[in-house]
């Protein structure tokens, strides 16, 4: 079983690239280890105000920090051909050996529809993602061996080529999922799983399916990374923590599927319907660091070995200092 690491979730839809890098470096100084950086072409709502290119930011994070780093998550299926994602990822790992992981997901219309193509239903998006992973892994494996490779599939074509800049060890491919079907496929075809905060019994079911898929492929699920991205709201008062959640991260209170919504302005209109009670069971909102510690510990006890924390407010520096002092040292594996 891997040791526990608690990293910083750099939300590039909220903070400009220079500030995101500074905050990640500050987090490491206060005991956080690693960075999960969001890949967005647009923010969730206009008030968030940013959407920088994740690979540029990760390269800068690598220069300023010593922990792991990866996109949380990128979609190798619409805006980006999987060959380009493979090249991005291989280059980052070549720059920072042993530190990079590739987090992928099936995509959301908010970011992916901008190229003007057909936006399929969820099942097809998942199928595209797993074919994209096949292309990425083909490129990784062939390139490590110094060979060319090609692919002709249902969704993607790759003519004979290789990655000419390729690290000795390919970065692990981690898949973001919240459903049991994809969790099983993730165990079978990927190297680890990423998910977000949810009821523990639901995540327990995901882990069961993930383990089932891994064993079918002859892999040990206990040796594969289990990664959590956890949104929370901390401030000096409960009232300010709630205000931060309502204004900065209203999407956290939306109890419906969001993958088909295309515009930050549409999200903004829907956010007007979000009420404080909508965050119940979805995100901890509290001024008490120990309340947050207890919530994080529950996920760690369930089996996560990496947790990336996102405080939804703009009070990042204060939050980093408080959690680095009062929360992280008290978490136990």
Question: Model regions: which residues?
Answer:
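Active-site-adjacent structural elements that line small-molecule/cofactor binding pockets in enzymes
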Residues: 1-333
């Amino acid at each position: 079983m891997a040791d526990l690491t608690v990293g910083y979730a750099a939300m590039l839809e909220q903070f400009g690239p220079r500030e995101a890098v500074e905050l990640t470096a500050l987090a490491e100084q206060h005991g956080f280890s690693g960075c999960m950086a969001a890949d967005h072409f647009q923010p969730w709502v206009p008030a968030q105000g940013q959407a920088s290119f994740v690979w540029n930011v990760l390269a800068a994070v690598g220069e300023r920090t010593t922990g792991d780093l990866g996109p949380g998550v990128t979609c190798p299926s619409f805006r980006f051909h999987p060959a380009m994602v493979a090249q991005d990822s291989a280059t980052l790992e070549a720059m920072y050996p042993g530190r990079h992981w590739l987090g992928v997901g099936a995509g959301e219309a908010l970011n992916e529809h901008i190229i003007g193509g057909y936006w399929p239903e969820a099942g097809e998006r998942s199928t595209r993602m797993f074919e994209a992973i096949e292309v990425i892994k083909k490129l990784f494996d062939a390139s490590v061996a110094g060979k060319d490779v090609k692919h002709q599939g249902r969704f993607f074509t790759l003519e004979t080529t290789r990655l000419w800049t390729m690290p000795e060890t390919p970065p692990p491919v981690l898949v973001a999922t919240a459903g049991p079907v994809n969790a099983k496929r993730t165990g079978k075809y990927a190297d680890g799983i990423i998910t977000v905060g949810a009821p523990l019994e639901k995540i327990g079911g995901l882990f069961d399916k993930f383990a089932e898929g891994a064993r079918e492929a002859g892999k040990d699920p206990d040796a594969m990374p289990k990664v959590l991205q956890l949104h929370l709201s901390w401030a000096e008062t409960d009232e300010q923590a709630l205000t931060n959640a309502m204004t900065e991260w209203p999407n956290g209170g939306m109890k419906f599927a969001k993958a088909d919504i295309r515009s930050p302005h549409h999200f903004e209109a829907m956010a007007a319907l979000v009420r404080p009670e909508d965050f119940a069971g979805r995100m901890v909102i509290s001024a008490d660091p120990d309340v947050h510690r207890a919530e994080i510990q529950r996920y760690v006890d369930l089996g996560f070995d990496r947790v990336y924390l996102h405080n939804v407010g703009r009070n990042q520096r204060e939050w980093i200092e408080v959690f680095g002092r009062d929360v992280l040292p008290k978490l136990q594996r």
